[in-house]
Amino acid sequence: MIEKRPISNLIGHLMLIIGIIIVVFPIYYTFVASSMSSVEIIRPPMPLVPGTRLAENYSEALSGGVERVVGVSLERLLFNTFVVAIAIAVGKIVISFLSAFAIVFFRFPLRMAFFWMIFITLMLPVEVRILPTYKVIVDLGLIDTYAGLTLPLMASATATFLFRQFFLTIPGELVEAARIDNAGPFRFMRDILLPLSKTNIAALFVILFIYGWTQYLWPLLVTNDSRMNTIIIGLRKMVDFTDASTPWNYVMVTAILAIIPPVAVVVLMQRWFVKGLVETEK
């Protein structure tokens, strides 16, 4: 029987409320700012209640306001970012799943050496890898293309490692039963591994989608054409060094719209995400 401790419960709830405020307040503040004019935003103190320009700001931003500032429409920025995030998430999962499948279930020379080569890349800083990768993309003529934005970010040593660890927990009897049933590698992967891995895949998809959605450095390097910019690059271009020349109302509108897709993915896949993390820990 769990002993009830009112003081402990009170402290726990208080810490939870403080944490929620710390996380939610900046988002609320951004939403309030998106309902005001630029002059109202930069004039301190800014009110904490929504202004009167909410519908007007969003309508203007979506109907050409952002395009006049950065040279590309807000819809295009969102579309580019969505394509990049989906391609990176799906690409990482597919490549990592197949890599881990080959390492665990196939017997070939130097297979563990290949695994450690993949694993060692976790220790390499991004700065070490980014310049050689950029040179390859330039030589292949993939600047200002979706392939250039996504292909170099699809390989994932972390996801490969997680899939490998999960595959190692699969009982040998299950593998042996598949062999007795004359199940080939593709059938074994399709009928056994994929159903068992669906929660892990869902958890990884959420994490990798957010990773792809928030990319800044790589899109900054490989996009010169504003039509290929992502939402994060668009936000950076909107912000000038002087407050007076920055369209803060459009910046706040864009920031709110940039938050919605990742939040929607987390909310819609929350049950699978939590279940996948718990099963990964096991």
Curated annotation (Swiss-Prot):
The lineage of its organism: Bacteria, Pseudomonadati, Pseudomonadota, Alphaproteobacteria, Hyphomicrobiales. It is a multi-pass membrane protein. It comes from Rhizobium meliloti (strain 1021). It comes from the Bacteria. The complex is composed of two ATP-binding proteins (UgpC), two transmembrane proteins (UgpA and UgpE) and a solute-binding protein (UgpB). PROSITE patterns: ABC_TM1. It is found in: Cell inner membrane. This is sn-glycerol-3-phosphate transport system permease protein UgpE. Residues 78-269 form the ABC transmembrane type-1 domain. GO terms for biological process: transmembrane transport. Signal peptide: none annotated. The chain crosses the membrane at residues 14-34, 86-106, 112-132, 136-156, 201-221, 248-268. Belongs to the binding-protein-dependent transport system permease family. Keywords: Cell inner membrane, Cell membrane, Membrane, Plasmid, Transmembrane, Transmembrane helix, Transport. The keyword Metal-binding does not apply. Part of the ABC transporter complex UgpBAEC involved in sn-glycerol-3-phosphate (G3P) import. Probably responsible for the translocation of the substrate across the membrane. SUPFAM superfamilies: MetI-like. GO terms for cellular component: plasma membrane.
